[in-house]
């Protein structure tokens, strides 16, 4: 069976990193449906962790628990612990505003706000901080530079973000997320709606962003997981089957289910 090539890890990638996010005996329910089953996983700091598996396996559900976005919807319940810097974010005592500023999220489809490019990035900052006009301008510029978009939009910050291309809109969404200076960046299939050139640019951006952020990415594209991630977790039917360094998952998986999935026998 065909195996997926994984780029050789650098010394920085193979060095042990502290744990940034950890799930402990995590279960999740959509009403009575048991969607995630006793998940235990540690996400290392300033590394890219990819979540892979067939549709409906629980990848995006796990991602949404990491910033409690599920709490916006009725009849959803998480049990267990999710620790961010050793604090349980599932505790009712953990402030939601604090969580939103520490954990950013980018979705599958670019969703720019119907406002100017500048205001798209400034919007979240205004809700969390009071900055002078000069500081806000510097903050927006820095975020757009981190989103690899500044050079393309610096002369049209007052124009509508809806006029940007799909790839530019997704990079704007990334800039908007990092503008709050989060610790963790969650990416839910961020390139699935983009063309190959835009996809390549986002992948390059992920590599650059991990210098400053802990990144968790959900992807159906195993080649993408192999290219961008340091660690990979394979999920199936709500279970975490295997989690290891990406090169190990794709070259020497310890579980037969993982082997079958990455070689295309199912999924």
UniProtKB/Swiss-Prot annotation:
Q: Which SMART domains match?
A: AAA
| Predominant location category | membrane
Species per Swiss-Prot/TrEMBL record: Xanthomonas oryzae pv. oryzae (strain KACC10331 / KXO85)
* Function as written in the Swiss-Prot or TrEMBL entry: Part of the ABC transporter complex PstSACB involved in phosphate import. Responsible for energy coupling to the transport system.
InterPro entries noted in UniProt: AAA+_ATPase (IPR003593), ABC_transporter-like_ATP-bd (IPR003439), ABC_transporter-like_CS (IPR017871), P-loop_NTPase (IPR027417), PstB-like (IPR005670)
Q: Which gene encodes it?
A: pstB
| Record's catalysed reaction(s) | phosphate(out) + ATP + H2O = ADP + 2 phosphate(in) + H(+)
Can you name one GO molecular function term for this protein? ATP binding
Please indicate if the UniProt record lists tRNA processing as a keyword: no
Instruction: From the Swiss-Prot or TrEMBL record, state where the protein is found.
Output: Cell inner membrane
Q: What does the subunit comment say?
A: The complex is composed of two ATP-binding proteins (PstB), two transmembrane proteins (PstC and PstA) and a solute-binding protein (PstS).
- Membrane topology classification: Peripheral membrane protein
Q: What is its EC number?
A: 7.3.2.1
Q: Which residues bind ATP?
A: 53-60
The protein's enzyme class: translocase
Q: Provide the protein name.
A: Phosphate import ATP-binding protein PstB
Which Gene Ontology cellular-component terms appear in the entry? plasma membrane
Tell me, what is an example of a GO biological process annotation in this record? Answer: phosphate ion transmembrane transport
